[in-house]
Amino acid sequence: GSEPLLLGEIWQDGSQFFTGDAFDSVMNYKLSFALGDLFLDKGDAKAADYELTVLRQNYPKEALYDLMNIVDSHDTVRAIYKFGGGSDSVAQPTKKDFDYNLGKARLKLAATFLMGYPGMPTIYYGDEAGQYGSSDPDCRRTYPWGKEDKDLIAYYKKVIGVRNAHKDIFARGDVNTLKAEGDIYAFSRKADSGKMGIVALNRGKAQQVTLPVSAADGTVFTDELTGTKATVSGGQLTLALGENQGMMLVQD
């Protein structure tokens, strides 16, 4: 449009800026804390969901759906580094002094969440390629040209593709928490047409998860990331979630 989007770098609740005379929206550091610190790092889905629910209640829908959703930034520890147990320090690590594979697995979960949640999913440059780093300024390392993690890039492309293919659901649909307990966090998105999508995340060991859903019995959902199908029975959808696995399911 002819008017630029005014986005504020605000770390706290940004409600006071949505009165029409300040910002259109803000960087969503509140989501970064809930998703990154409480859920993916500490395994407390209930606490994470509480923070996100308060956010949804406080913000006008127009601002909520325009939030700059992040999991890390130029001012924070790189997500892959934190999720892999890296230390939050101004000292620059000279080697991968963290569990890269664990960090990568949970970064994939973060990407899945961002692509399924209301707001503008934002990727801090290099996250998709496996760049790591501790506190500012170490988090501002250059892009790892020629050393990119191609598997991670492919995963980012896949979840971005799912969001783009189902914008009516994952970009614009209503959101509702289905389960938030320990290592499991799941929420639904519902388009104006009534078609549903579900994002289910497991940041722990493999387990079977049962979710309450409003869809009719016999309704089939397909995970757009793996092709796995699940059918609603008794108002519930049962999923077999692998270790550190995320799903983006869409109603057939």
Residue ranges and their predicted role:
Residues G1-I70, F113, G130-K167, T177, ...:
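Active-site-proximal helices and loops of the catalytic beta/alpha 8
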Residues D49, L55, S87-L109, A165:
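Aromatic-anchored helix/helix-loop segment that forms the rim or "lid"
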